[in-house]
A protein has these predicted regions:
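Charged phosphate-binding loop/patch that engages nucleotide di/tri-phosphates or the phosphate backbone
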Residues: 118-145
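C-terminal beta-signal and terminal closure region of outer-membrane beta-barrel proteins
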Residues: 112-116
Length: 145
């Protein structure tokens, strides 16, 4: 369900989010694929009749994360990051993050965010502000380890 809007083009995601879902940031407008979570949450509510706000938030933020995530949001975020059939190149740390996720979900989220930001920087891509804010929350917790 988290990826129910993933097949849409970037242009369609932006147009549909402008029309139906939450406001679209400039980074999201330039990187429409980021919106499949927001639009997916809208469809989960309107097409699949999901009313649980935690589930809807988990769908909405499964790509970017968000500060103050619940355990369910963390689990869905990590499930998306760790799925075995991702198109994005995997990192050498992926198996280690999978292992850590079973004992320390917060640390696994931190490492996933750290790897995501490194990948975006190295590939010259923009970082969504919500992802940056989420990383900062976890960095403050784990930077001295």
């Amino acid at each position: 369900l988290r990826d129910c809007a993933k097949a849409y083009s970037d242009e369609q995601l932006v147009a549909d989010c402008d029309k139906y879902a939450s406001p679209v940031t400039e980074v999201e407008r330039r990187n429409g694929f980021l919106l499949h979570g927001k639009l997916g949450a809208f469809y989960a509510r309107t097409k699949y009749y999901i009313t649980d706000e935690e589930i809807l938030s988990s769908i909405s933020y499964h790509t970017t994360g968000r500060p103050g995530m619940t355990d369910l949001e963390k689990a869905v975020f990590l499930a998306d990051y760790l799925e075995p059939f991702r198109k994005q190149p995997t990192t050498p740390e992926l198996n280690e993050i999978r292992r850590i996720a079973f004992s320390d979900i917060d640390k696994a989220v931190y490492l996933a965010l750290q790897n995501t930001l490194r990948y975006l920087k190295e590939s010259g891509q923009e970082t969504d502000m919500t992802t940056a804010e989420t990383y900062e929350e976890y960095r403050l917790k784990y930077e001295n380890e």
